[in-house]
UniProtKB/Swiss-Prot annotation:
Lineage: Eukaryota, Fungi, Dikarya, Ascomycota, Saccharomycotina
Protein function: Cooperates with the reticulon proteins and tubule-shaping DP1 family proteins to generate and maintain the structure of the tubular endoplasmic reticulum network. Has GTPase activity, which is required for its function in ER organization.
Root EC class: hydrolase
Lumenal side: 699-701
The species this protein was found in: Candida glabrata (strain ATCC 2001 / BCRC 20586 / JCM 3761 / NBRC 0622 / NRRL Y-65 / CBS 138) (Yeast)
Gene name of this polypeptide: SEY1
Name used for this protein in its record: Protein SEY1
Similarity comment: family membership: Belongs to the TRAFAC class dynamin-like GTPase superfamily. GB1/RHD3 GTPase family. RHD3 subfamily.
Keywords: Coiled coil, Endoplasmic reticulum, GTP-binding, Hydrolase, Membrane, Nucleotide-binding, Transmembrane, Transmembrane helix
Subcellular location: Endoplasmic reticulum membrane
A Pfam short name: RHD3_GTPase
């Protein structure tokens, strides 16, 4: 297949912007890859370059009609595409694509001494081609200008400056095609002459620094082909052309010309951009860094391919990922699929460019894709973490686990959720959806640890609340019982009872003397801290109980009770019966001293060994143990031990004395009352004077019956202690009677009031009538 040629660079030195479209038309939908070759021809004007190309590659370049006029035919640089190479083996198209550059001839009359385009065209051809065909006639060999050796020298110098330090094995094949070789001079002799000239030219080059020892063969390979005379040896000419064509298509032949190191390793669309940039820099007389141009082309094309692949990936990612976020298996599978498709598409089209650039852009593309995948993986793992933390929390509260210590429950459940999280993150990592999992593992561990602290704090608070509740009940019950029955060793009992309550309440947590483990996974210091907090609470509670209970009135009551028990009862708890006031006074003094023995004990918490009761749980509190003043401006050194100050104590004593004095006076009055009894003869007088009344009662059956009923009722009421209910019934009856009487009286008063009011109204009406009558009579008299 051969396409119509286009002008790649016109006479005005402008690069054809439609060239890329031309390449697309030539290639179609085929994936050419690197399976294409660029071949250019270089030589003097009217030397038959276009004719040779048309015969060899079946192209359709314009040719000169020598019978009309010898003149310039090819203007600028033309490009043609072909797959049909003239050869001995086959007349069908080859598998490779050939792009042929027909360069304007040198030394033409049309340009005269303007050799600028010749040099630029030659430099362009050698920069973009794999094979540069140098077309010359046999009779030109040995000439300097005629066989373009001067132009080749210029091209060699520029080429050396461009590629002198490139450090790779890229070369350009200089294929010298000797035209009209009639065979008089052997081809080998002509070849040696040309090689000698070329080596001489190379030796005379101005080599840049670092390239002094380079040779012609470091940059170029040389091949020589002779063609018979086209007119005089027509059959030989065409046979030689086919032999030349064989060397372009038979890759198995030793004479195969298109070696891999001649190729620029750019896909066809990349080659077009590369060629355009090369010409732009050549035309603008810039230093032409061809390797850099190849890299720039590779960068542009690979970036374009990467952007296209990423755009497709993004579209699929944004439309479908959210639907699969709750299903790990489906999510991982889908993310893996779209990532592989994205990278596969990039690899397919970008791997043809420079390997370093391709790999660099691939890394950038992978980073962009992984960034999106990282977002999705993070979201899924955050959701999974929330689910697992909820599972951990619920598992900690399950009945079958609640009996286990906190740390045992936590470790058991943590292993399960950790395994589930590790399985999920490993699946993402194994599918290359996550590049790093350490940060996720650390975040998960931190989240779980934070949840553990929350759960532990919650359970610890619940446990402490339960302990404090038990302490509150026990301290209030047992300590108030002791305070209500004070003894000289009261505070020894209070502190001992306090310690016993603490030990009993915390017995299940005790691990040694003064050592406790609350089974919450706390450190030794943390357990000590919790124990001291509980002990501080207990001491605070005890202080509150003591100070709230031992108020002034309560202490007075305790002193009075202690006085009463000693004053009214003997050592056997038998009530005392006093015969005279001396006995009362003696008992009063003893009972008073007995009661006041505990006054100091109740107002100041001091043990029997003389030491004040000082809580041992407030060592770190700045206010405990310091001098402070109370509401009465009395200073104390310890707020727990000092229950009442001296002023309050004196007030208690005064109230106590007043109350016991009243008690003594009542006792003395009872002695006086019992000593002033009724004389016996009075009873004899009552019997004599009331004998008749007694007899009336005894002889009357009704009175006897009522008397018996009254006596029996009194007996049973007294025996069973029913005076309370009886009095309630009596009081209720009296109350009802009283209410009824009041209601009746109220009605009576109201009725009487209404009657009086009615009578008054009637009287007023009568008076009004009388006044009217009298006035009317007066009027009649006046008339």
């Amino acid at each position: 297949m051969t396409s119509q040629a286009i002008q790649l660079i016109d006479v005005n030195k402008e690069y054809n912007k439609e060239s890329l479209e031309y390449f697309k038309q030539c290639v179609g939908t085929r994936d050419v890859g690197f399976n294409y070759h660029v071949i250019s021809v270089f030589g003097s004007q009217s030397s038959g370059k276009s004719t040779l190309l048309n015969i060899l590659f079946n192209t359709q370049f314009d040719t000169m009609d020598a019978q009309v006029k010898r003149q310039q035919t090819t203007k600028g640089i033309w490009l043609a595409h072909t797959q049909n190479v003239n050869n001995h083996k086959s007349t069908t198209d080859t598998d490779s694509d050939y792009f042929i550059l027909d360069v304007e001839g040198s030394d033409g009359a049309e340009r005269g001494e303007d050799q600028d385009f010749e040099r630029k065209a030659a430099l362009f051809a050698i920069s973009v081609s794999e094979v540069l065909i140098v077309n010359m006639w046999e009779q030109q060999i040995g000439l300097y200008q005629g066989n373009n050796m001067g132009l080749l020298k210029t091209v060699f110098e520029v080429n050396l400056s461009l590629f002198g330090k490139r450090g790779n094995d890229h070369k350009v094949l200089l294929l010298f095609v000797i035209r009209d070789h009639v065979g008089v001079t052997p081809l080998k002799s002509l070849q040696e002459s040309l090689i000698t000239e070329l080596e001489q030219i190379w030796s005379e080059l101005n080599k840049p620094t670092g390239c002094e020892e380079t040779t012609l063969y470091d940059f170029f390979d040389l091949e020589f082909k002779g063609l018979g005379h086209k007119l005089l040896q027509e059959e030989q000419f065409y046979d030689d052309v086919k032999s030349l064509g064989d060397s372009f298509i038979d890759s198995e032949s030793n004479e195969y010309l298109l070696k891999p190191n001649y190729h620029h390793k750019l896909p066809i669309d990349g080659w077009n951009m590369y060629a355009e940039q090369c010409w732009e820099q050549i035309e603008n007389n810039r230093d032409l860094d061809l390797p850099t141009q190849q890299i720039l082309v590779a960068r542009f094309k690979t970036e374009d391919i990467a952007n296209e692949a990423y755009a497709k990936f993004t579209e699929e990612y944004e439309t479908e990922t959210e639907k699969r976020i709750n299903d790990k298996t489906e999510l991982v599978s889908y993310l893996k699929k779209i990532k592989d498709e994205c990278l596969g598409e990039y690899d397919e089209h970008a791997s043809r460019y420079a390997k370093a650039v391709y790999e660099e852009k691939r890394i950038e593309l992978v980073d962009k894709v992984n960034e999106r995948l990282f977002t999705t993986a993070s979201k899924y793992l955050d959701m999974l973490t929330a689910v697992l933390l909820t599972k951990l929390e619920n598992g900690m509260k399950e009945k079958e686990n609640i009996k286990l210590p906190f740390e045992d429950r936590y470790l058991k459940l943590f292993k399960d959720i950790e395994a589930e999280f590790d399985a999920a993150i490993t699946e993402f990592f194994s599918k290359d959806l996550l590049t790093k999992i350490k940060d996720f593992e650390l975040k998960f561990a931190a989240d779980v640890h934070e949840k553990k602290l929350q759960l532990r704090e919650s359970e610890l608070n619940a446990l402490l609340s339960k302990i404090k509740k038990q302490l509150t009940l026990r301290i209030k019950d047992e300590e108030i019982e002791l305070l209500s029955k004070p003894t000289p060793d009261l505070w020894d009992k209070v502190t001992d009872t306090f310690e016993n309550i603490m030990k009993k309440t915390l017995s299940r947590f005790a691990t040694g003397e003064g050592e406790y483990e609350f089974k919450m996974g706390l450190s030794e210091d943390e357990n000590k801290k919790q124990y001291h907090a509980i002990r501080a609470f207990a001491w605070t509670l005890l202080e509150t109980v003591v100070h709230d209970y031992l108020k002034e009135d309560t202490i007075v009551s305790l002193l009075r009770d202690r006085f009463e028990s000693k004053f009214r009862y003997d050592s056997n708890d038998v009530p005392r019966l006093w015969k005279n006031e001396d006995e009362i006074d003696q008992s009063f003094r003893v009972a008073k001293e007995h009661a006041l023995e505990i006054l100091d004990i109740l107002t100041l918490a001091v043990k029997t060994d003389g030491t004040e009761v000082i809580p041992d749980a407030f060592e770190d509190e700045p206010n405990e143990g310091l001098i402070y003043d109370d509401s009465h401006d009395v200073y104390h050194s310890n707020r727990f031990a000092h229950i009442l100050n001296e002023t309050q104590k004196e007030k208690v004593q005064q109230q106590f004395r007043r109350q016991i004095n009243v008690t003594v006076l009542d006792c003395k009055r009872s002695i006086v009352t019992s000593s002033t009894h009724i004389p016996i003869w009075i009873y004899a007088v009552i019997v004599v004077l009331g004998w008749n009344e007694f007899m009336i009662v005894i002889r009357n059956p009704l009175f006897v019956t009522l008397a018996l009923l009254s006596i029996v009722s009194f007996y049973f009421i007294q025996k069973f202690g029913l005076w309370g209910p009886v009095m309630n019934v009596v009081n209720t009856a009296l109350g009802e009677s009283r209410t009824t009487i009041k209601e009746k009286l109220r009605q009576f008063v109201l009725e009487e009031h209404e009657l009086k009011k009615t009578a008054k109204v009637e009287e007023e009406i009568e008076l009004q009538d009388l006044s009217k009558n009298s006035s009317s009579s007066g009027n009649e008299d006046s008339d």
